[in-house]
Amino acid sequence: MAEKFDYVNKIWDIADYVRDTLSQAEYNKLVLPFVLLRRLENALEDTREDVLKALNEHETDWGLDNDNYCNASKRSFYNLSNFRLKTLGAIDTLNNFMAYINAFSPNVREIFENFDLENTATKLNKAGKLYEVCKKFGSFDFSPEAVSDRDMSDIYEHLIEKYGEAIAEGAEDFMTPKDIVRLAVGMIFANDDEIMNNDTGIVRTLCDPTAGTCGFITDALDLLEEWHKDKQMKAPAKIVPYGQECEGQSWAMGKVNLLLRNVAAKGKDKYDKRNDLSQHILLANTLTDDKFENMYFDYQLSNPPYGKKWEKEKDSVQEEAELGFKGRFGAGLPSISDGSMLFLQHVVAKMKPADEGGAKAGIVLSASPLFNGDPGSGPSTIRRWLFEKDIIDCIVKLGSGLFFRTSINTYLWILNNNKPNERKGKIQLIDASDIKTSMRKNRGKKNCEISEDQIAWIIKTYVDGHDHGKSVIVPVEDFMYRRVTTQRPLRMHMVIPESFEFKDDLPYLSQEGKNLVYGVVAKYIGDNPYKSALQLSKELKTTLAYTIDKLPKRQKSFFTPKNIVKWLFNNFGVIDSSYEAVDLKGNPIPENELRSYILINPQNIITDSNLRDYEDIPWDTDFDEYMQKEVLPFTPDAWIDKTDTDEKGSMPDHKIGTVGTKISFNQYFHNYEAPKSPIEIAKEIIQLEKELQSFEADFLK
């Protein structure tokens, strides 16, 4: 019957009716709460008289806010009013409407508060339209008999897509498409025999820290029911949902989704309808306010916003990061421009420990967390921490065009802190970027979907651990490397001509001091280049001692022999590759002895900072072998600076080179495209020239 109900056009008629009263940006504040209100009203209709009877008999003892009324409503919510949307009356409509809303149980009232329903109703009432709007919504049949839970969920999804532009504004995507949800849910439940087949009533927890409208949670529950449906179990596994959402209207939608769960199940309901599945869906910012502190979950699902800044949460996040691994963000902090790796760390922190059975999680991320950040940076160290914890089980590259509000490629990360032995120390990469089906009609930017068969193929590839053209299983070390610094000797001669000017002055000196410098430098015209620099630096410091002594401490510290030599080279040095390298005393090092000198005493060679370079050496690769093969054939006077060690980030090992991490799908799934032939390119150039000539002719007419 739900398919016959043309809710899109009928609700659009109502939006059109109020267009002079509410702006288009406010339609969501009308459409969404009124649809939810009508669904609640329909769900309570059968037990309304029982609730009013309980109120009459027990109001003195129970008051108005008491869960005992749920025994009469047979739901996890209730309403103590005689009103319906169709019976509010044309006179005093606003007061009657608010009395009706305030007669709901507290868990429903807080939902409507976050929709700012009273303000919307007041605007409609002032325009004389509230009564008609209530009557129109009151005529819709959203009863459990007419609209199933799944159909109602579809209605919500379409309404959010059409009217929910203002919800979670600024987030790239607050609603995860169902095909992505079903894939993620299928992957975290895969190979879990207890959740699929246990008939002893086990209870498992599922949390979404970026709950949005609770699409992940509701579809996880739907899938579990589908799988259990044909098994005729007496006590199948039960999921208790938890979640947090910081945007009020998204939270309200998600809260209602779970509050109304199974209202259409009748006698086949596998849950106690008086059990409020929405009770653990809380309104709070996950990054700044962990509502489930010291709690750990069996499963987690999350689709955090892509590229969303976390500057508003900065103080709170940094404060927790200072706790190290006693907090949620001990591994490191990502760039302020994208907080998705904070959510990734949060999910890991909330996984049930392996010694208690372990946990699995699915989180949808953009490409950035795979490779962003230099070695030692926050993002790189976060990945390193995940590798060392051996918690990444699989990453699936999804195709473009799968989400409603972004066309970028996304990646589904599957986390598991209790991997089977054969998968320990490894990560499976699945390239599903072309595993999708075109849709007949676009929904926003979503023009493709993953079919049920395609979802099954991806899950089977994951479960079986297939290593084929679309899947590889790789040791975590393949995603790690060390960035080492390479140095080369300074090859320079210093020319002090008979007539000279300084290119730059020694800082902080008075004119008198600069004149002293000029006089000292003039005495060294034509001397040995390096020895002159060393002798000059000493004499300058002696000559300027009185002047320098008068300077503030911070300025005084500039005048070291090293800085003065650098200043001399900046003014008089000439790079010349034909010159020999020299040691710190200015002695030349014969070219045939340079390599031996480098191996024995490289720290005594004057280096050229302009030739300093970096090499990313794969993990466990011998440094000397790498240099012999990749560097020395091209720069035979280079060496690795062994003083540059791994000191950055939250887990330094103090070894040579800074540890870096990156996960590159292109390394394993690169599709080679042969370049165009010269003949084909020549034809294209000729065609472009003809088009250009034609354009010029038309332009000059």
Q: What name fits each language-model region?
A:
Residues 17, 26-39, 332-415:
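Conserved Class I SAM-dependent methyltransferase catalytic core
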Residues 134-135, 164, 233-236, 274-282, ...:
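Short acidic (Asp/Glu) and glycine-rich catalytic loops that position anionic groups and cofactors
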Residues 170, 174-302, 307-309, 314-319, ...:
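Conserved S-adenosyl-L-methionine
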Residues 21, 311-320, 324-338, 368-378, ...:
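Short, contiguous acidic/charged loop-to-helix segments that flank catalytic cores in large enzymes
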Residues 404-504:
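Flexible, glycine-/basic-rich loop-and-beta segments that form/coincide
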Residues 296-297, 338-340, 356-366, 389-393, ...:
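Active-site lining segments that contact anionic ligands and/or coordinate catalytic metals
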Residues 218, 252, 302-304, 341-349, ...:
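Feature representing long, continuous alpha-helical segments
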Residues 1-193, 266-270, 277-286, 397-400, ...:
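Non-catalytic, mostly N-terminal accessory regions of nucleic-acid modification and defense proteins
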